[in-house]
Amino acid sequence: EAMNQGIPVVTWDSDIPTSRRITHVGTNWAQLGDKLAEAAFKASGGKGKAAMVGLVGASHMEAAFANFRAWMEANAPDMEVLPVFDDEAVVAKAHSVTAALIQKHPDVAVIAGFDGSSGGGICPAVREAGKSGTIKVVMNDILPAHMECLKEGTAQYIVGQKRHIFGPIALQTLYDINHSGISFTERD
C-alpha cells in the first residue's frame, strides 16, 4: 500500500517479494541452505543421518531447507536427510524437538539449526543426551550462545549473517532515494 502512495519501501532481514518493495537487504536463504549442508557434510564426514531444525512454513526458511536437501542429494550419497523438525523459532521448542529427535534417531550424525533460536536449543539437548562431539551440530547466526557451543565443542560450524548491517544499509538506501533524485520504475 505504501508503494501505491509513492512511498518507497525497502525490506530487510526477511523479504516480502510480493510487496513491490524497491529492494531487499538481507541473507540469500537458499545459499544459506547450501552453506549449512556443506558444513553438515564436512562435520559428519559425509555419512549418516542429517536433521534440520528450524521454523517451518516461513518462505525464507523453506528455501533454506529445500537447498539443504538438494545439496545433500547432489553431493552426499551416503547421507539420509530426515524431515524438518519445527522449532517455531523458540529456543525451548528447539530444545524439546531436538531431545525428541535424538530419542527417535539415536544414530543421527549431524543436526543443522536454521534460525537464531535453533542452536540455543540444539546444543543443550545434545549435551544432555551425552552426545557432544558424537552428534555434530552446525547452525546459523553468530550469537553468544552459539559461540559458546562452538568453543565447548558441542557445535562444529556456524554459518554467519551480517545482520547488524541490514538495517543501516536499508535506511541509507531509503535516504539516498529520497535525497538524491534516484527514481525507480516497475521494471527496476
Cite the ranges covered by each PLM segment.
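A residue-level marker of the well-folded mature domains of exported/periplasmic proteins
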Residues: E1-D188
